[in-house]
């Protein structure tokens, strides 16, 4: 099982060119989608038509990471901009195969932290919980956690689940706070999760059951 930002993990920060973040169009989505389906596990994928519908509502965006020196799209991210909370939800982030492990993932994330200049609160990130069994998978999972923590993200002390077609998948929920923002109060975190479930996961029939389970555990 991979988390929704698996392929952004860097094994070491190398000298890479700066990148430019460009908002993608529906035409870009068509080009990215084949790569997207290869990057993430089937139970974590969104269908093409659903992503297209989300993007048409303007708050859900496809962002392309372009290296202007080599004229390549080196990665991409899908983000959701909150209605009231001045922050974003990082739904997916991936770096192209040939550029993984070179530093582009960290560079892309740092660009996202500057997505808004004024009043930006931070970024929510879903991260896979490490499995108990020692081995390659667990080490990769721990490395992803170190990646985000090194960039300043903090794990929220809540039992979060990602709604999938089959059930709710337990995940860690991290939050990267802007330098002038403390960790968000519980009420704002719950509001953010509720908004994401209603907007991003509108295609999941039992999303409300997963959400109610979250509220029950947090009363």
Kindly give the residue locations of the regions a language model identified.
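Short amphipathic alpha-helix that is part of the acyltransferase structural core
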Residues: 7-50, 195-202
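C-terminal "cap" of GNAT-fold acetyltransferases
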Residues: 140, 154, 161-210, 214-219
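Conserved active-site alpha-helix within GNAT-family acetyltransferase domains
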Residues: 129-157
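Conserved GNAT acetyl-CoA-binding A-motif
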Residues: 116-136
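A short, internal acetyl-CoA/4′-phosphopantetheine-binding micro-motif in the GNAT/acyltransferase core
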Residues: 93-100, 129-130
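A conserved beta-strand-loop-helix scaffold within acyl/acetyltransferase catalytic domains
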Residues: 41-69, 73-94
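Conserved acetyl-CoA-binding loop-helix of GNAT-fold acetyltransferases
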Residues: 101-116
């Amino acid at each position: 099982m991979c988390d929704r930002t698996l392929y952004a993990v860097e094994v070491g920060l190398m000298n890479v060119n700066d990148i430019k973040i460009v908002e993608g169009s529906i035409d870009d989505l068509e080009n990215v989608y084949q790569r997207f389906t290869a990057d993430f596990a089937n139970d974590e994928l969104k269908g093409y038509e659903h992503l297209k519908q989300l993007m048409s509502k303007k708050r859900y965006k496809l962002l392309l990471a372009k290296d202007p020196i080599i004229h390549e799209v080196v990665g991409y991210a899908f983000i959701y901009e909150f209605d009231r909370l001045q922050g974003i939800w990082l739904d997916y982030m991936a770096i192209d195969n040939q550029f993984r492990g070179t530093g582009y993932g960290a560079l892309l994330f740092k660009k996202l932290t500057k997505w808004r200049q004024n009043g930006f609160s931070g970024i929510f990130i879903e991260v896979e919980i490490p499995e108990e069994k020692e081995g390659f998978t667990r080490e990769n999972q721990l490395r992803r956690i170190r990646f985000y923590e090194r960039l300043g993200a903090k794990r929220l002390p809540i039992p979060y689940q990602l709604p999938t077609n089959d059930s709710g998948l337990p995940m860690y929920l991290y939050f990267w706070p802007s330098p002038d923002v403390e960790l968000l109060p519980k009420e704002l975190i719950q509001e953010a999760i509720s908004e994401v479930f209603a907007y991003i996961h509108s295609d999941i029939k039992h999303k409300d059951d997963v959400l109610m389970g979250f509220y029950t555990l947090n009363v």
